[in-house]
C-alpha cells in the first residue's frame, strides 16, 4: 500500500465492506451511533449521478434514455440499470469506469474535510472496497460476512426480488471468502442483530485504544501536502 509510508493512517482510515446483504449497513450504523464519522460510498454514488453532473451526462450517453426517468426530473432508474449490470459484465465495467473516478474524488474531499476537523478515525463504508482498489490506500480493513443461504434469504426479503436475482447480485461481486482473506478484521454475522452490535462495539473499543491516530495529528501537515498529489494521480488513472 503506497500510503504505508505514513503508518498512522493504518488506524486512522478504516475500510468497511462485506457482501450484498451480510449486515454492513448495521455495522456502519453502530459506528455512527458511537460518533465515528462515516463516508458512505453508496451515498456518494447517488450524489455524483444527480441530473446535470458530468457523470450523469456520461451515463446517459453510455446507456441511453431508457435508463432515466424523464417524468421525474430525469433521475437514474437504478433498479432497471441494476438488472442490466448484474447480468452483463461489460456493462458493469462501463458503469464502474464512469462512476468510480467521481466517487473516489468526492470521498477524498470528504476525507480531507474530516481530517481538518480533527476526528480520531474515519470509516469508509463501501461494498467494493477490494474490487475498486480502495484497500490500496486504506490500512485497516473490516469485512462483515454471513453464510450464503442467509445472505440470499435476507436479499429476497429486503429487496423483494427472486432467489435467482439475489444469487446473480451476490456472484457479481468478489467472493466473500476472498474478502475475508484480505481483511484485517472479520466480523461473523450469522447470529442475531444484538450479537452483531456487540461484536462491533468490541471492534470500536479496539480502535479507540489505538495510539496511531494521535501520531497522525503530528504528521498531518506532511501528509496533507503529499497525499493529494498521489491520490489525484490514482483516481485519474
Curated annotation (Swiss-Prot):
List of residues binding ATP: 18-25
Protein's name in the database: Uncharacterized protein T05G5.5
Pfam families given in the database record: CoaE
Any Gene Ontology CC annotation: mitochondrion
Entries under PROSITE patterns matching the protein: DPCK
Keyword Nuclease attributed: no
Gene3D superfamilies: P-loop containing nucleotide triphosphate hydrolases
Family as reported in the entry's similarity comment: Belongs to the CoaE family.
Keyword Transmembrane helix among record annotations: no
GO annotation (BP), single: coenzyme A biosynthetic process
CDD domains assigned to the protein according to its UniProt record, in alphabetical order: DPCK
Domain of life according to the entry: Eukaryota
UniProt domain DPCK: residue ranges: 13-218
Amino acid at each position: 500500500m503506497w500510503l504505508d509510508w505514513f503508518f498512522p493512517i493504518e488506524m486512522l482510515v478504516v475500510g468497511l465492506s462485506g457482501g450484498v446483504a451480510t449486515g454492513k449497513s448495521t455495522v456502519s450504523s453502530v459506528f455512527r451511533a458511537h460518533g465515528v464519522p462515516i463516508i458512505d460510498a453508496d451515498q456518494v454514488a447517488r450524489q455524483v449521478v444527480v441530473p446535470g453532473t458530468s457523470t450523469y451526462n456520461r451515463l446517459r450517453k453510455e446507456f441511453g434514455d431508457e435508463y432515466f426517468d424523464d417524468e421525474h426530473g430525469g433521475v437514474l432508474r437504478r433498479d432497471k440499470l441494476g438488472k442490466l449490470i448484474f447480468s452483463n459484465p461489460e456493462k458493469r465495467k462501463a458503469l464502474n469506469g464512469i462512476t468510480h473516478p467521481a466517487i473516489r474524488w468526492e470521498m477524498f474531499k470528504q476525507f480531507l474535510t474530516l481530517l481538518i476537523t480533527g476526528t480520531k478515525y474515519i470509516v469508509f463504508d463501501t461494498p467494493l472496497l477490494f474490487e475498486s482498489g480502495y484497500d490500496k490506500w486504506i490500512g485497516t480493513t473490516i469485512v462483515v460476512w454471513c453464510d450464503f443461504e442467509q445472505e440470499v434469504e435476507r436479499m429476497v426479503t429486503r429487496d423483494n426480488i427472486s432467489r435467482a436475482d439475489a444469487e446473480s447480485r451476490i456472484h457479481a461481486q468478489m467472493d466473500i471468502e476472498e474478502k475475508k482473506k484480505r481483511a484485517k478484521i472479520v466480523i461473523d454475522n450469522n447470529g442475531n442483530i444484538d450479537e452483531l452490535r456487540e461484536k462491533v462495539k468490541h471492534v470500536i473499543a479496539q480502535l479507540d485504544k489505538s495510539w496511531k491516530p494521535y501520531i497522525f495529528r503530528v504528521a498531518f501537515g506532511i501528509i496533507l501536502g503529499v497525499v493529494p498529489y498521489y491520490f489525484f494521480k490514482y483516481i485519474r488513472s
